[in-house]
Amino acid sequence: MQRTPAMRVLVPALLVAISALSGCGKSEAPPPAQTPEVGIVTLEAQTVTLNTELPGRTNAFRIAEVRPQVNGIILKRLFKEGSDVKAGQQLYQIDPATYEADYQSAQANLASTQEQAQRYKLLVADQAVSKQQYADANAAYLQSKAAVEQARINLRYTKVLSPISGRIGRSAVTEGALVTNGQANAMATVQQLDPIYVDVTQPSTALLRLRRELASGQLERAGDNAAKVSLKLEDGSQYPLEGRLEFSEVSVDEGTGSVTIRAVFPNPNNELLPGMFVHAQLQEGVKQKAILAPQQGVTRDLKGQATALVVNAQNKVELRVIKADRVIGDKWLVTEGLNAGDKIITEGLQFVQPGVEVKTVPAKNVASAQKADAAPAKTDSKG
């Protein structure tokens, strides 16, 4: 068959088109997978001061209820409600008229019995009176002397004085009111606010754990600062003055399972008032060679266990189950599962899994592990 010029042009073109179509069916080889990059923090052992934050209430250092010790009508109130008073300062004046008369009568009776006792003393020497008569006269004199002292005390009690220095509250009585010795209601109450008590409660389990750690050497006592306490107010501000631990209760409350701890704080400006809700920060002790792990690198699995991903010497990811004791600042205090020198992953966690080889760079989302903020940890922040 003889090819025409048109066929000679068409055949090579078809061959080229078929070759091109067959080339389109072949897929290119995928590029090699890139090694994921993660941000890590290298852990270092450090000395950490452990604090516990506990809720509490303020209480007056001393409380004295002012009550009358004699009966009578109130003539004057001599203080301003809500003011500061001194011990021995007069607060009320009870009508003294009756007690002044009793005192004068007792003095007159004393003079009479004293004169008679002295006369009988001379007469008994001459046997003009019996020894019994002299003894009776001397006893009457002594009774009169005691009556004068009692009348003087009652007269003094018409001036109602403050038993302690402190701030006095509102007055429960006014001028013209009748008050009686031994009445149930106080006339006023004086509270000493400087210093002031702070009573906090700590679970007995936490107290037992603290004692065990101190006994085993896991914790060291914080020396001169062992009994120091700081205070956070209800609005979140820090109280500027430091207090000291006074005592802990000798028994555990059966209803709450807690122990009461009392601290005392200086309060020169009366900034703290009785009944305020506060948070006391108690220094437990010092932990040597503590491991602090950034919170960004600690997660929990389905069982609720704290876990962390670390990069081993072969640059591969390892899963560690750890024991996170408490939060200190923005880090977890880890007591098991991590060691000094471990490289904990804090960035890129979502791109890796155990066994994967990774490329490490210093993390940017956390501060240096060497600059741990040893802020107080609440007792409920343990993991």
Curated annotation (Swiss-Prot):
Residues with lipidation of kind N-palmitoyl cysteine: C24
UniProt-annotated location(s): Cell inner membrane
Keywords per UniProt: Antibiotic resistance, Cell inner membrane, Cell membrane, Coiled coil, Lipoprotein, Membrane, Palmitate, Signal, Transport
Membrane topology reported for the UniProt record: Lipid-anchor
Classification via InterPro entries: CusB-like_dom_1, CusB_D23, MFP_Efflux, RND_pump_MFP
Signal peptide (residue range): 1-23
Lipid anchor positions (S-diacylglycerol cysteine): C24
GO biological process: protein homooligomerization; response to antibiotic; transmembrane transport; xenobiotic detoxification by transmembrane export across the cell outer membrane
Any GO molecular function: identical protein binding
Main localization category: membrane
Coiled-coil regions, chain positions: 97-151
Documented activity regulation: Export of antibiotics and solvents is dramatically decreased in the presence of the protonophore carbonyl cyanide m-chlorophenylhydrazone (CCCP), therefore may be driven by a proton gradient. Antibiotic efflux is inhibited by pyridopyrimidine derivatives, such as ABI-PP, acting by binding to a hydrophobic pocket in MexB.
One GO CC term on file: plasma membrane
Record's subunit section: Component of the MexAB-OprM multidrug efflux complex, composed of six MexA subunits forming a hexameric tube, binding to a MexB trimer, which interact with the trimeric OprM outer membrane channel protein. OprM is thought to not directly contact MexB; instead, MexA joins MexB and OprM by forming a funnel-like hexamer anchored to the inner membrane. MexA may initially form a hexameric ring complex with MexB prior to OprM, then OprM undergoes a conformational change as it contacts MexA, allowing the periplasmic gate to open.
Further details from the record: In both X-ray crystal structures approximately the last 100 residues are not ordered.
Protein name: Multidrug resistance protein MexA
Protein's organism: Pseudomonas aeruginosa (strain ATCC 15692 / DSM 22644 / CIP 104116 / JCM 14847 / LMG 12228 / 1C / PRS 101 / PAO1)
Encoding gene (name): mexA
